[in-house]
């Protein structure tokens, strides 16, 4: 799989920064002064961050990791507003309808881009209805197996799947989640037939994996690595381009036999469409500074993610590529959901 979405896109976006700054330098002194004045006046009151999932999960923790230092930097409270439901759609719709003044923003994850194709009647457009602020971090997924599953590595797993089509059941935290779609991507690329068993969250899926009721699954490093190190499940490989700094003993799927296989989840901040550019730039600039802080970087890495922090244009390109990428996987798998 080409790396044009996720990590490859992130690197390409960083290279585009120098071109963008040249364009910004062409602004007239008057225009530049006006933009600075508007952004300097923001914020004058608390900022609300909509999190479309429950407290304590990956999205919530990522939001708090940057929300706390953001409040300090802008000298205004940053209020976390958890609005879970419908795979993140309830919170995202609320964000899309919010006043576009910068005082309501939201954190979304990879499933946000997949929803554009997964749902036939989405009440917003995953990209066009929003103003991207910054990609906060990307999180590789780890492919794990039950200890009772006979395959000890990727080569053996693929051999079992090909020898007995349909014999392997894989779990996910829900239909359309990054973990589900990454397994669909693997199956499509390798011509495999496997049975998907969706759960309502990672915890019950992991419990059945450890109990031997399910053979394999993808999920985040933060959720799976403790169980791997405790010997309760077996690591097969990571969906990143290089080994994870905190788990060098686990190979990537690319080096294990799937060249170019890169996938995962991510978390990024959006504002409602129509939010003034000066306000978006102010927020984006703060987030970029925040994710470079050593303590914030360490906090994000502890969650199994890689800090990014990029500009609005870069995040928009990234989101567009993610929508297109997952549309192909979803359409080939003939997946559709109703809200």
Where do the language-model regions lie?
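N-terminal secretory signal peptides that target proteins for export/translocation
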Residues: 1-15
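Sec/Tat signal peptide C-region and signal peptidase I cleavage site
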Residues: 31-37
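An extracytoplasmic/periplasmic, membrane-proximal ligand-sensing/linker region
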Residues: 44-46, 192, 277-339
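Hinge/capping helix and adjacent helix->loop/strand transition within the periplasmic-binding protein
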Residues: 97-103, 117-204, 253, 266-299
């Amino acid at each position: 799989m080409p790396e044009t979405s996720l990590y490859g896109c992130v690197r390409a976006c960083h290279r585009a920064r120098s071109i963008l700054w040249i364009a910004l330098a062409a602004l007239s002194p008057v225009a530049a002064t006006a933009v600075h004045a508007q952004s300097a006046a923001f914020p004058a009151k608390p900022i609300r961050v909509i999190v479309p999932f429950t407290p304590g999960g990956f999205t919530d923790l990522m939001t708090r990791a940057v929300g706390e230092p953001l409040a300090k930097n802008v000298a205004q409270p940053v209020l976390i507003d958890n609005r879970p439901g419908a795979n993140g759609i309830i919170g995202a719709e609320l964000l899309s309808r919010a006043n576009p003044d910068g005082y309501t923003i939201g954190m979304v994850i990879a499933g946000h881009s997949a929803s554009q194709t997964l749902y036939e009647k989405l009440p917003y457009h995953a990209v066009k209805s929003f103003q991207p602020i910054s990609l906060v971090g990307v999180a590789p997924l780890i492919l794990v197996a039950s200890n009772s599953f006979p395959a000890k590595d990727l080569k053996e797993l693929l051999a079992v799947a090909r020898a007995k089509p349909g014999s392997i059941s894989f779990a996910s935290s829900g239909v359309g989640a990054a973990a589900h779609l990454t397994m669909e991507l693997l199956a499509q690329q390798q011509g495999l037939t496997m049975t998907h068993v969706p759960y309502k969250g990672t915890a019950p899926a992991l419990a059945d994996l450890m109990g031997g009721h399910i053979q394999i699954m993808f999920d985040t490093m933060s959720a799976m690595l403790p169980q791997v190190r405790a010997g309760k499940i077996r690591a097969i490989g990571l969906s990143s381009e290089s080994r994870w700094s905190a788990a060098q003993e686990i190979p990537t799927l690319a080096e294990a036999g799937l060249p170019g296989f890169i996938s995962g989840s991510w978390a990024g901040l959006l504002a409602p469409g129509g939010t003034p550019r000066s306000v978006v730039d102010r927020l984006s600039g703060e987030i970029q500074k925040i994710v470079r802080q050593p303590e914030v970087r360490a906090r994000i890495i502890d969650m199994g993610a890689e800090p990014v922090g990029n500009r609005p244009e870069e995040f928009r390109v990234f989101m567009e590529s993610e929508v297109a990428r997952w549309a192909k996987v979803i359409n080939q798998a003939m997946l559709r959901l109703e809200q």
